[in-house]
């Protein structure tokens, strides 16, 4: 069995911050993986019999190229694929937008605590501290929201510098989502920085 890691970074150096940490997690768990740049994905990779799951990594704040190239991700909706997919930050945005979600500007940088209202992968309902680094959020009714944060305005952005700050339960900004009928998961935060166990669980367990 093999995990396909999809690199969406325009700049090669960003690979070391957003992709390599995920590769390192899988390597330590002795999980076989293949990493490929999103523009180079072909049916050969997607229909590989060894392919079990897919992770779409995030990228830097200044890199929005992937948002202009969503046609490269049409395969996400292929019925014959039917593999669990886990999108991280930009990866979650891609998953939502492919299913015709709405992109909204919402810059969040730093650590906050968010409330998981239901079990999400191996996260039981609880308060979790997560690391955020993004300019945009996504809204999509095809996905169920498992955890969220309040939309930040003006001076409220300063709250992100306080790791003790607890986000609102109003779930205005989805931080953890799952497609209502498909094994497609997304997180706006970066589990490769904090909460590595989420990646280990997705890769190692049987995902419904």
Task: Tell me what each language-model feature is.
Residues 97-197:
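Pocket-forming structural segment of enzyme catalytic cores
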Residues 87, 91, 96:
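Gly/Ala-rich beta-loop-alpha elbow adjacent to hydrolase catalytic centers
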